[in-house]
Structure formats: C-alpha cells, structure tokens
Amino acid sequence: LALELEHVNIALDGFELCADLKVGTGGFIALLGPSGAGKSTVLNAVAGFVPLASGAIRWGDARIDHLPPGDRPVATLFQDNNLFPHLNVARNVALALTTRARPSKDDTRRAEEALSRVGLSGMGARMPGTLSGGQQSRAALARVLLQNKPLVMLDEPFSALGPGQRQEMLALCREVLGGAGRTVLFVSHDPVDAAQADAICVVIDGTMSPPRPVTDVLDAPSGPLRAYLGK
C-alpha cells in the first residue's frame, strides 16, 4: 500500500469533504466528478496546502499529514504550467534540482535528459513563449520527473488542450511516471480522460468513493454520477 487517506475530513468556507482512499504502489487513479465537487481539495490536502479537520494521510507506514508541503513525498502538476518566461526551457526544468540562476552542467544535462523523455529533445534552449501549449505541458512534466517524488498528482494540467492532446498527455504520464513505479492521482471532469486510469474514484458533493474498476464506473453509473454523465 502506497497512499492511504483514513477518515479524512476537510472543512473550508462552509464546504465539507469526506474521503477514504487506499492506493497501491504504481497505481494510476482518476478522481472524476463535476467542477466544485472537491477533487482538487483532495489533492491539496495530500500535498499539504489545506489542513485536515480530522483523519490521517499516510504514505506507506508513515503519517505525512503533519509534514510541511516541501517534506511530503509529493509532486503536483497544476493547471498553470508555472514556467518562468525569462528562463529557457532547460533552466525551467532544472529548477527541480536547484534554484541557482545558472544551473550546473550536470543539472542542465539531467534537465535535457528529462526533456528528451517527454518528447522535447533539443528544445532546452527555447524560451517558454515559443512553445505550443502541448509542448509547455511536456516541459512542466519534465520538471516533475526531475523532482523524483514517488507520488505525482495532476490537477487538470492539460485542461487547456484539446481532447486528443489531453489523452496523449495522460498516456505519456502513464508511460514516464507509471513506468518508473510512481503512483499517480489525476483530476478530471471528463469520463473519456478518466477511462485511461487503472481505477476511478467518483467525487460528487464533497464525498469520494473508493477506487473502482473503470468499466464498473463508466459502463453502469449510478446515483449522482449517472445524472452527471447524462446516462
């Protein structure tokens, strides 16, 4: 068992969310539901950006909910790729390794290797503004790779892309993250995107279901999910 949320309760500005979750090492899990349901809140709680009202978050055998965000075994990719426009692509990626204005030759080499893994070989000298939206997403993914955290969370980082590109990016995430044994949680409001997961947690009205097989969730939805999907 890699990640566990045990009786987690979060209360923010009148919104309350309850979540229990168990995910094995290397799992590729979708959190599916409408906007405002609490999907991003779950990720923010795991990352340490919002406090728990009660419950526990564990990674392996250790509780992590008391740790500051920087000390948790988590890397997060947000909707905004957070690429600095005044730094070239390689330097942006190397920020996962150093905050120095000029990274070392070794850090630059590692950044270039990460860029190659996501299909951006030879683009390290480019400026972010010269990249397409899909290429910027790949550069941000390369930076997450270099963070080398065992848990990666994707908070709809590809939402600005078209459906085909989103699915291509999710497939790339599965390849480069899942292939390295990392556990991945990704947020989606699109059942087609969520279908790429190993399992789906449905998040609606502040309640999250346990992970269930993709076909069970999408082929025979019930309750609020059935209404949301229009089936």
Regions found by a protein language model. Give the residues of each.
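Helix-to-loop junction immediately C-terminal to a conserved catalytic motif
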Residues: 47
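ABC ATPase NBD coupling module
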Residues: 63-78, 99, 105, 217-221
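Short coil-to-helix segment of the ABC ATPase nucleotide-binding domain corresponding to the Q-loop/switch region
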Residues: 87-96
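Conserved ABC ATPase "signature" region
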Residues: 105-123, 174-175
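Conserved ABC ATPase signature
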Residues: 127-131, 135
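A short, proline-enriched helix->beta-strand linker immediately N-terminal to the Walker B motif
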Residues: 146-150
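Catalytic Walker B motif of ABC-type/P-loop ATPase nucleotide-binding domains
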Residues: 152-156
